[in-house]
């Protein structure tokens, strides 16, 4: 089965985890940014999981270097453009890029300038390629609560202009949703859609709380609902889409192997599963690679993929017009 030629949708892709290594090197040289190595083969080890990784926290260390080159308008625009260029080459028709604006203020940019720069890169790529992109703003759980309010408030002016949703990301502690009730309440009032990283690092109950306390419409990862019957039941009853990222889950030790990953069990049981990359560079993956691995190790069929694709269309925060266009590509999903 040629997965490369199939139309695809990406709902969970971090901008700072999906840079070209050549671009990191190019910007570092241009802007005099120190790197541990200026040799591409050596640098890859600092930004990608090449062999083993023991935890989500270790995985997140791979973002340190990419963020060093994402501190100017020009660089942010370029990196956003290149991400859409890369996924368009993988026949991705629609992507929701997510990033945390406050990771990009080191050289004095304000939140509005940061968001504008990324949106400019997305829009420039849309003009050149058969792809549509939207932006999800991330609030970092390892920063204070006022910082989350700041992102929500300052990003609101871009809703309807490319920004579609708010997210909570970074390391996952038990019962984190309780801290963010007022933040997400405000986000909902502004008109943001809501997706929350939860159930990625061993705490299925966080998914339950993300839905009940934060009004999450989608869940990033959600793999650990397999160990929380109440969360599983709620996700199924409310038809909450899961943005699953199998290779990333292997890297963070949320799953031992592709075969052991619960996505197929969830899919067969009617859970609205979608397949995503999480971080193309950190996990050294593409949507095509994800599908090839799931086909090889889990028996993913073309009919399964049709369901996954339509799940992603429905789960997306795209406009109704864009969704209709995306649905029209279903006829191209053939073995």
Curated annotation (Swiss-Prot):
Binds 1 zinc ion per subunit. Belongs to the metallo-dependent hydrolases superfamily. Adenosine and AMP deaminases family. Adenosine deaminase subfamily. The active site is at residue 200. GO terms for biological process: adenosine catabolic process; hypoxanthine salvage; inosine biosynthetic process; nucleotide metabolic process; purine ribonucleoside monophosphate biosynthetic process. This is Adenosine deaminase. Zn(2+) binds at residues 12, 14, 197, 278. It comes from Clostridium botulinum (strain Okra / Type B1). Catalyzes the hydrolytic deamination of adenosine and 2-deoxyadenosine. CDD domains: ADA. Its EC number is 3.5.4.4. One of its GO terms (cellular component) is cytosol. Keywords: Hydrolase, Metal-binding, Nucleotide metabolism, Zinc. Its cofactor is Zn(2+). It catalyses: adenosine + H2O + H(+) = inosine + NH4(+); 2'-deoxyadenosine + H2O + H(+) = 2'-deoxyinosine + NH4(+). GO terms for molecular function: 2'-deoxyadenosine deaminase activity; adenosine deaminase activity; zinc ion binding. Substrate binds at residues 14, 16. The record marks 221 as: Important for catalytic activity. It is an enzyme of class 3 (hydrolase). SUPFAM superfamilies: Metallo-dependent hydrolases. The keyword Signal does not apply. HAMAP family: A_deaminase.
């Amino acid at each position: 089965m040629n997965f490369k030629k199939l139309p695809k949708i990406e709902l969970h892709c971090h901008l700072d985890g999906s840079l070209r290594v050549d671009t990191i090197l190019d910007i570092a040289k241009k802007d005099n940014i120190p790197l541990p190595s200026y040799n591409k083969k050596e640098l890859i080890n600092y930004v990608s999981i090449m062999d083993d990784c023991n935890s989500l926290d270790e995985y997140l260390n791979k973002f340190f270097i990419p963020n060093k080159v994402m501190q100017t308008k020009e660089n942010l625009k370029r990196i956003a453009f290149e991400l859409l260029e890369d996924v368009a080459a993988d026949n991705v028709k629609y992507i929701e890029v997510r990033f945390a604006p406050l990771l990009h203020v080191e050289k004095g940019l304000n939140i509005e300038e940061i968001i504008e720069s990324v949106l400019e890169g997305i829009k420039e790529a849309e003009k050149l390629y058969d792809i549509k992109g939207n932006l999800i703003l991330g609030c970092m759980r390892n920063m204070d609560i006022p910082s989350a309010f700041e992102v929500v408030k300052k990003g609101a002016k871009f809703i309807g202009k490319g920004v579609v949703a708010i997210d909570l990301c970074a390391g996952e502690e038990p019962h984190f949703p309780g801290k963010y009730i007022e933040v997400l309440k405000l986000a909902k009032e502004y008109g943001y859609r809501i997706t929350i990283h939860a159930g990625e690092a061993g705490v299925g109950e966080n998914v339950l709380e993300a839905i009940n306390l934060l009004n999450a419409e989608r869940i990033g990862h959600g793999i650990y609902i397999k160990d929380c019957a109440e969360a599983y039941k709620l996700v199924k009853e409310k038809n909450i889409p899961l943005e699953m990222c199998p290779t990333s889950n292997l890297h963070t030790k949320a799953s031992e192997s592709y075969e052991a990953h619960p996505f197929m069990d969830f899919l067969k049981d009617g859970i609205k599963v979608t397949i995503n990359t999480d971080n193309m560079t950190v996990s050294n993956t593409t949507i095509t690679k994800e599908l090839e691995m799931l086909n090889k190790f889990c028996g993913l069929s073309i009919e399964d993929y049709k369901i996954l694709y339509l799940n992603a269309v429905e789960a997306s925060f795209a406009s109704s017009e864009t969704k209709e266009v995306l649905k029209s590509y279903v006829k191209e999903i053939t073995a």
